[in-house]
Regions:
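Catalytic-core signature of thiol
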Residues: 1-222
């Protein structure tokens, strides 16, 4: 195939497109109604009506706002329903703290990053950068198994004892600051490894960093 797109190619593409009248029908539908509406198949909608024979009680609703904790909200919603049912609690008056889970999520993720740096054999910065070890070191995202691990280790907290605060619903800036701090800590660990610091001292450094992270998160999330 030629390296450059030629006008002959464009003419051939155009002729192929225009030779199929169905393309023009699709084009008109999308340009007039948008892609999403144009893709709707009414027969599928008619065959799949949102009618259910089981209705679950409705609990409190919380605005996720500017954070990426959908995985935490989903996990807590599942647990809250079962807890309210088993303990005979009014679901509309009961909620669990997503902020509590998010606190330990960040602390655990920072620990994992530190441990990865301690375990790494090649301390060359270009290698670390190429392996993307620090690119997304402490993010907001998560999944069910990660949620389960945090709950099994740290338990749960009623929402009223650790509610959402100003920054907990606007976590992008805080996550950025926290990542910067963790990355700086990792550079210190890498430098210490290059100086052949023994494993016990590296672990002490990590514990110091984790204590700082705990204080950081406590001041911001409560």
């Amino acid at each position: 195939m030629k390296e450059q797109i030629t006008l002959d190619m464009i003419n051939n593409f155009s002729n192929t497109y225009n030779s199929n009248s169905f393309n023009r029908i699709i084009e008109n539908a999308i340009t007039e109604n948008g892609l999403e509406k144009s893709c709707i198949d009414k027969r599928i909608i008619e065959e799949n009506q949102p009618v259910f024979n089981i209705e679950l009680p409705d609990g409190k609703r919380y605005d996720q706002k500017d954070n990426y904790r959908c995985w935490i909200y989903c996990g807590l919603n599942t647990i809250q329903y079962d807890m309210a049912k088993n303990l005979n609690i009014d679901l509309k008056k009961f909620a669990l703290s997503n902020n509590y889970i998010a606190f330990f999520d960040k602390l655990e993720k920072s620990n994992n990053v530190y441990q990865n740096i301690i375990n790494i054999q090649n301390t060359d910065w270009e290698y670390v950068d190429k392996e993307d070890i620090l690119q997304y070191c402490v993010n907001e995202g998560g999944h069910w198994q990660w949620f389960v691990s945090i709950v099994n280790k740290y338990g749960l907290m009623p929402y009223e004892y650790m509610p959402d605060v100003f920054e907990s619903l606007r976590m992008q800036n805080i996550t950025g600051l926290f990542n910067d701090k963790v990355k700086k800590d990792c550079i210190k660990l890498l430098n210490a490894k290059r100086e052949n610091t023994n494993i016990d001292d590296l672990r002490k450094m990590k514990e110091t960093f984790l204590e700082e992270n705990y204080i950081f998160l406590s001041k911001i999330l409560g």
